[in-house]
């Protein structure tokens, strides 16, 4: 706990840096909050809950959460399709953890990404890395107000599931 604020710093305090030349945007200073990658979210539509969702994964959390949300809203996937869809991760920003490094030009894609996509990205100068998984577990509940139901969706990246009642 810090002072009399009641706020525990936990491991997220490591997101701060002490020297401006390491990362000028996240230097520790009075009144500043560390960049946090914790991402539980609740989307509201027409003043009602539309989607409750979260993802694990450190600095890729925000990227994966946005891609999941866009898969549902823009690409009209159902909650399960959106949770299982491939994600692309960029490492252009300073890391929140460890040495706070960044890897300009590095992009991670799932290993089932079509070869022509990887080739095109590499032709643009990106360092493309493929992995079996590009996201931590994604879990979500979609509120179907039209039919009075809730639908759970979860990625197949672990022993995760979405439940609503």
Regions found by a protein language model. Give the residues of each.
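Proteins synthesized as precursors that undergo proteolytic processing into mature forms
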Residues: 1-131
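In a subset of proteins, long, contiguous C-terminal domains/tails are tracked
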Residues: 115-165
